[in-house]
Amino acid sequence: MGHKPLNEQVIVITGASSGIGLATARMAARRGARVVLAARSEDVLADIAAEFGTRATYVVADVGRREDVQAIADHAVATFGGFDTWVNVAGLTVYGPLRKIALEDHERLIQTNLWGTVYGSLIAAEHLRGRGGAIVNVGSIASDLAFPFQGLYATSKHAVKGFTDTLRMELIAEGAPVSVTLVKPASIDTPLPNRARNYMDREPTLPPPIYPPKEVANAILHAAIHPQRDIFVGGGGKLFVMGKEFAPGAYDELASAIIAQQKRTEPPRNPKGALHAPQGAGRERGDPPIYVMRSSAYTRATLHPLATAGLAAGLAATAALVLGGKRARRRP
């Protein structure tokens, strides 16, 4: 199964006002695609769409509401005559121990991360059955790993993986010309921690190694053209998953270290975050206190399998960083 070149596609992107979604929208537009941007922040969406001129349109939507997601699809059809790729990026997180997090915060996270993906995927599949195309869901290495102090985030991403795999199998059984890809990023330098609901006594951050959002955007757009079942973004994340599969009990014993790696030294800046109301959108990147990798040689090699030498080098470099506990500060 193959898909149209990117410069002939219309691509719907949820969560397009910040982070991975924004990076994907910009990269897609630069490569000639027309884009339909969806998020909760209207003023930010309007500014982003203005960057791309007639190649972009936007819809203010909360993906936790099915009627809003249907409105995204309807707007894409009305504006561009349909769409070829649907990318579910919208997602939130909550930091803190499970026992201390309010039930309404748990529910809101699941509504966005899981149900937003379910609504988007099913609506997209209905449209694409007749014309072919791609559904790309953004999971996480938390689709394969538990994360203490991000328990419901990991729960939601495990569920996204199960749903995505099932949808793929059902579309294959139908003979539908629709590819379904799960992209699983490691830690990515986005504003996600800054916009999180935070119950901790410190400002949240991400465990190393951290990768730039352009790596995820590139993987997503690769899947829009070249169907691929799963894509890990970040060799460090792949190593963690492999380690957990090899020694799950040993991974459990890392709980205290994993919790510590999610805390900065300063007190919380904005503990309510953007869980229940949009705020802090408009930026691709966050402000992690440690070095951010320039790229992921591992991921680029998996997208281009002939680059085996690059894959080996990337894994070796990432292993050295993870095992050595390198803590160099981010370069300006």
Task: Outline where the language-model segments fall.
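Active-site helix of classical SDR
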Residues: 121, 156
